[in-house]
């Protein structure tokens, strides 16, 4: 048995905000901006040194599409980010997956928008404990280089991605595939620069690499020419079987990064618990070994990589799924399968149920509605953001209240941004009206989102 220690200390409250957002990532940045634009005093607590989360620290580009005609942004702030990214010259709409952007440039814009809106940011700070009175959070104990501090607030929003704040506050959660107990695979993405993308595409003749340098995910023993090249490399010992289990690249040249190639790999299928520091450490170490192996493979088997070099490696491991927090309403696969709509739906999507895995574990399918003439998308209700058992806590992003298979569909950036905007607006409504988040009418949240410029498909 490990030796146990007791630790007691007095901590001074050195900060306070009406709305405290834990995690300045995909959902958290939007949640904070939304609340600030509603007149709230807002503080973001973020353990890294920039905003954006997976989009920046994990290099996740492009945004992907919600799968609804017109790709409506249920978040006006998300739409603004996309528009301003294009105006700033580091993004473009087009190609097979809309929403390409340079992840190295995104932090500049997100910080600018947060500051324009009056959001305060506290970087390099991590919540480690929650102070509660009955079922209400009164303060967070946070740690930074200067020590321990207390941060007080009225409404708290968990945008940590893994539901860290909710767990600290005592909320229940589920985790992983109920059939296997495993979380979705995790990745360590990287970006190459100075790739001759046309020469790269010219290596194959079957368009398995498009003319601008895009390749959809590679599967082991596939019939496309790029897969045959990779199989030969594996047989020669230049790649491993795991390298072929998932490989995908996205061009960044039209996003203002000449010769840029974003790589959605390597992907790991074991030790995939995003809440286990040993798993995260192993992925960082093994991932870097794999990335160097990938670069050597490109230079040996493809044209266009003569001058290519690694310019970015994810500072944060790419987590697809970890915890799903118990909320007042849980989105089920049955809801998605019948394209269920809710009066208080704060986000809409028809992104596929996208579960990564090896062999038969891999699932990527669009749900099919059973109802005749149903609009081809489902909605996320406001109740999926209201943490059960904690009076003044909302959750947004990929860890909202939903089943594992639904989480595989809602985890993309446009949907996470929409949940963040809804949470920020709901927090401001709760404070202005002196009520708890669970007492807020989700229909009013949706109406306010639309009033602010969010676009919802009619259904």
Q: Residue locations for each model-derived region?
A:
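Short, hydrophobic/aromatic-rich segments at coil-to-beta transitions
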Residues: 134-140
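Flavin (FAD/FMN)-binding glycine-rich loop and adjacent Rossmann-like elements that form
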Residues: 2, 10, 54, 81, ...
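Conserved N-terminal/central alpha/beta ligand/cofactor-binding core
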Residues: 8, 16, 34, 40-41, ...
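Glycine-rich Rossmann-fold phosphate-binding loop(s) that bind the pyrophosphate
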Residues: 23-26
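Extreme N-terminal leader/targeting segments of oxidoreductases
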Residues: 1-19
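Residues forming the Rossmann-fold NAD(P)(H) cofactor-binding site
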Residues: 29
